[in-house]
């Protein structure tokens, strides 16, 4: 991308605003090196990435990027053996914490169902160095000092230092409080010179205290003396301080070596958080300028809906719809100067540059933009004083360069094409230049005030006229772009509003050809038609938005209704299942009683006992089952029944075997130890195939129930989860399952570790592994059973 294009389209000013939203020098460095890309896939990915960060901001308000600094030079110094200072080590620890915190932040959102595939990939590259981080913070305090607890030796040395300092101060303070002190001392204070404790002694009493003179006042009347009685104590103190310094250096070297070992990982983490800072800066900037994600196409057309210039206050600027590349490849904006034509031109250019840089652009949703390999712009008066070039010559030098390089993958922006020379020749040149660029397939937006170019838009298939609306009543441009309507000067209307007499204006009209007057009148009618059409469109758009709002409200109500309905159905189902479970338990109790009767050698159970047992079985079934109508389609009459056939007795939900037919509609059926008469309408023939696949059903205490092939533990407390795993594995073994899956999610990893620790000890487990990509990855453990 040409540097001149970036400059005239004020790309660097956008970058300056973007810089304000970075959280660290790492992100700022990324912004400073930002340039538009020309790779379609890269641009799409950058836009998607910015959109994910914008989603995070919408949901959370911010991202935890605090505490991150550029530690790359410090890490590289550690790598070559230089000792790092406490503050440098603390910066490394803080940055490691910041990267770890950012990783956890994104992963927590993903675990809660927020789809962030690109950001999730970014944070997956961050490697936690918690142990190193804690070693540093355990040794270095928040103020950058090495703390006493950094080592036992350092704690002992500092205890010695504090003891020595206390003894020295005590002796010196006794001296300053003595009866002669006021006479011999300049002041009753204890101070420090050359890291040794001293007292201020008057010049004439220097020999009283003995010791060493370390300093004197500016007047020479006061000497700062270390009295002889504390010289040994001060010496001991200095020795302890030397030991302290040596121990601190040892600790810092040890920590520096730890950093050097993990240097490559630390630098990799820094690169990831630098990218994250950069990504979120783009998202915050999008929020600031009310920008949206454009649809990026490779079809060489753009559709900017309600586009605004990002550097102009959104409350002031008038948004415009700008389309280019489908029905027409060139827009020629005509009309007088100071009408906002240049702003429109720059809006197109800066939106393209921003989109190709991965920035969201200030447009409405569903706007589309394409990728250009080159963007050329000839905007403004950039004549060169050094080269003694006129305005026209300066523009022409730039245009010649554009004509040499422009092709079908280029966007070309011309401001006041052909200006600065004779109007007739300038207009002719402008037409010729536009033809040349259009023939090369480039997309072109050009502004001009030459009336000759109004006809140009009608004489070329791929060219359309446009103008910026002017309000004659207020004598000011509205900055509203009118596609399909050429501009007009409005000179007569403006002059009339300013007080010029009608006579002079009428005479002026006579100097203009009839054809020109007709064209001006036609343009005025086009403007009026455009306004009416736009007003109708705005009304239709308002109705559409109102309909969408109503539709969303109805959808919300339907969803709420369905949720309430489902909740009630689930509740009713749960209650029904509880009743059925209670009935099954009651039935098991009855069967157990009958078995006990049989064990008591009462082989012939009396009729009244059977009747009583049968009625109790029927009474144990809940009302839900009793009232259920038998489905005639599945009943036995469709199958020719024979003695020995296996059937299901629908009333009890139990299997039985046909003994003999006792009437046209009844059979004698053996159900366990019971023998009873059952109507054919209450039976269902069981067709047992020769080879049957193993069903996911286990039988426990005469009870059939379904065992799932997977166990979902997400959201469970650790203790409850372990209890469920134990029961589930037992049930799965009873069901003869060869393989099952346990879903524990990714999260912090505690539940996953707990599950796998348990599996290692379980006798029924053959092997286990993480799930493959299609099975749930690290969030699932697949278990092979013996």
From Swiss-Prot:
Name all Smr domain ranges: 711-786
Recorded hits in SMART domains, A to Z, give:
MUTSac, MUTSd, SMR
Enzyme class (EC, first level): hydrolase
Asked if Hydrolase is a keyword of the record, the answer is yes
Q: Which GO terms describe its molecular function?
A: ATP binding; ATP hydrolysis activity; ATP-dependent DNA damage sensor activity; endonuclease activity; mismatched DNA binding; ribosomal large subunit binding; rRNA binding
**InterPro entries registered for this protein in UniProt:** DNA_mismatch_repair_MutS_C (IPR000432), DNA_mismatch_repair_MutS_core (IPR007696), DNA_mismatch_repair_MutS_sf (IPR036187), MSSS (IPR046893), MutS (IPR045076), MutS2 (IPR005747), P-loop_NTPase (IPR027417), Smr_dom (IPR002625)
Protein EC: 3.1.-.-, 3.6.4.-
Q: Which residues bind ATP?
A: 335-342
Pfam families attached here?
MSSS, MutS_V, Smr
Query: Which keywords appear in this protein's UniProt record, sorted alphabetically?
Result: ATP-binding, DNA-binding, Endonuclease, Hydrolase, Nuclease, Nucleotide-binding, RNA-binding, rRNA-binding
Swiss-Prot/TrEMBL GO biological process terms = mismatch repair; negative regulation of DNA recombination; rescue of stalled ribosome
Q: What PROSITE patterns does the annotation carry?
A: DNA_MISMATCH_REPAIR_2 (PS00486), SMR (PS50828)
Biological function: Endonuclease that is involved in the suppression of homologous recombination and thus may have a key role in the control of bacterial genetic diversity. Acts as a ribosome collision sensor, splitting the ribosome into its 2 subunits. Detects stalled/collided 70S ribosomes which it binds and splits by an ATP-hydrolysis driven conformational change. Acts upstream of the ribosome quality control system (RQC), a ribosome-associated complex that mediates the extraction of incompletely synthesized nascent chains from stalled ribosomes and their subsequent degradation. Probably generates substrates for RQC.
Q: How does it assemble?
A: Homodimer. Binds to stalled ribosomes, contacting rRNA.
Family affiliation: Belongs to the DNA mismatch repair MutS family. MutS2 subfamily.
Q: What is this protein called?
A: Endonuclease MutS2
> Which gene is the coding source of this polypeptide chain?
mutS2
């Amino acid at each position: 991308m040409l540097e001149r294009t970036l400059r005239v389209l004020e790309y660097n000013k956008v970058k300056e605003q973007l810089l304000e939203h970075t959280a660290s020098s790492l992100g700022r460095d990324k912004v400073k090196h930002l340039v538009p890309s020309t790779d379609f896939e890269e641009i799409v990915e950058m836009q998607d990435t910015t959109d994910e960060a914008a989603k995070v901001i919408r949901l959370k308000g911010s991202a935890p990027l605090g505490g991150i600094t550029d530690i790359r030079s410090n890490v590289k110094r550690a790598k070559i053996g230089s000792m790092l200072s406490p503050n440098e080590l603390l910066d490394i620890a803080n940055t490691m914490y910041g990267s770890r915190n950012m990783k956890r932040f994104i992963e927590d959102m993903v675990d809660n169902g927020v789809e962030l595939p690109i950001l999730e990939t970014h944070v997956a590259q961050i490697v936690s160095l918690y142990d190193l981080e804690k070693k540093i913070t355990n040794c270095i305090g928040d103020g950058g000092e090495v703390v006493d607890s950094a080592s036992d030796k350092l704690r002992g040395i500092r205890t010695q230092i504090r003891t020595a300092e206390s003894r020295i101060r005590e002796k010196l303070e006794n001296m300053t409080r003595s009866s002669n002190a006021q006479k011999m001392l300049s002041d009753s204070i204890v101070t420090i010179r050359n890291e040794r404790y001293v007292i201020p002694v008057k010049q004439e009493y220097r020999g009283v205290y003995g010791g060493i003179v370390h300093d004197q006042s500016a007047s020479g009347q006061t000497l700062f003396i270390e009295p002889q009685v504390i010289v040994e104590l001060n010496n001991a103190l200095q020795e302890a301080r030397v030991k302290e310094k040596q121990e601190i250096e040892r600790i810092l070297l040890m920590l520096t070596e730890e950093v050097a070992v993990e240097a490559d990982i630390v630098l990799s983490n820094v690169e990831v958080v630098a990218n994250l800072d950069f990504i979120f800066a783009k998202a915050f900037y999008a929020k600031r300028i009310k920008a949206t994600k454009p649809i990026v196409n490779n079809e060489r057309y753009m559709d900017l809906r309600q586009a605004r210039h990002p550097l102009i206050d959104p409350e002031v600027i008038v948004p415009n719809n700008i389309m280019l590349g489908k029905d027409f490849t060139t827009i020629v904006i005509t009309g007088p100067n100071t009408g906002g034509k240049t702003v429109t031109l720059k809006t197109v250019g800066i939106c393209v540059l921003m989109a190709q840089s991965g920035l969201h652009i200030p447009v409405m949703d569903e706007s589309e933009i394409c990728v250009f390999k080159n963007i050329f712009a000839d905007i403004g008066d950039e004549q060169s004083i050094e080269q003694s070039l006129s305005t026209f010559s300066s523009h022409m030098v730039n245009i010649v360069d554009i004509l040499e390089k422009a092709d079908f993958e280029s966007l070309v922006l011309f401001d006041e094409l052909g200006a600065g020379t004779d109007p007739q020749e300038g207009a002719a040149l402008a037409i010729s230049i536009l033809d040349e660029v259009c023939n090369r397939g480039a997309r072109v937006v050009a502004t001009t005030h030459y009336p000759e170019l109004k006809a140009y838009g009608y004489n070329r298939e791929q060219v359309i006229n446009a103008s910026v609306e002017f309000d004659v009543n207020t004598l000011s441009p509205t900055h509203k772009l009118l596609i399909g309507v050429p501009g007009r000067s409005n000179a007569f209307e403006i002059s009339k509003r300013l007080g010029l007499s009608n006579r002079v204006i009428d005479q002026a009209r006579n100097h203009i050809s009839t054809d020109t007057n007709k064209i001006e009148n036609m343009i005025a009618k086009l403007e009026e038609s455009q306004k009416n059409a736009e007003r109708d469109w705005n009304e239709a758009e308002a109705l559409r938005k109102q309909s969408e709002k109503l539709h969303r409200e109805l959808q919300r109500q339907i969803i709420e209704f369905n949720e309430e309905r489902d909740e009630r159905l689930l509740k009713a189902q749960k209650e029904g299942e509880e009743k059925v479970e209670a009935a099954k338990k009651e039935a098991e109790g009855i069967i157990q009683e009958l078995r006990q009767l049989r064990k008591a050698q009462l082989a012939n159970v009396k009729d009244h006992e059977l009747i009583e047992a049968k009625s109790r079985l029927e009474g144990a079934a809940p009302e839900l089952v009793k009232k259920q109508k038998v489905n005639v389609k599945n009943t036995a009459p469709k199958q020719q029944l024979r003695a020995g056939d296996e059937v299901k007795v629908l009333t009890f939900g139990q299997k039985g075997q046909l003994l003999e037919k006792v009437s046209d509609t009844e059979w004698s059926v053996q159900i366990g130890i019971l023998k009873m008469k059952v109507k054919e309408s209450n039976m269902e023939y069981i067709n047992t195939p020769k080879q049957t696949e193993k069903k996911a059903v286990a039988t426990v205490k005469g009870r059939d129930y379904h065992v799932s092939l997977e166990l979902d533990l997400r959201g469970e407390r650790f203790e409850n989860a372990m209890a469920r795993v134990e029961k589930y594995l037992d049930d799965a073994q009873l069901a003869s399952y060869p393989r099952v899956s346990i879903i524990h999610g990714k999260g912090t990893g505690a539940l996953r570790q707990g599950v796998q620790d348990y599996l290692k000890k379980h006798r029924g487990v053959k092997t286990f592994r993480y799930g493959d990509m299609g099975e749930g990855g690290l969030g699932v453990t697949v278990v092979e059973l013996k």
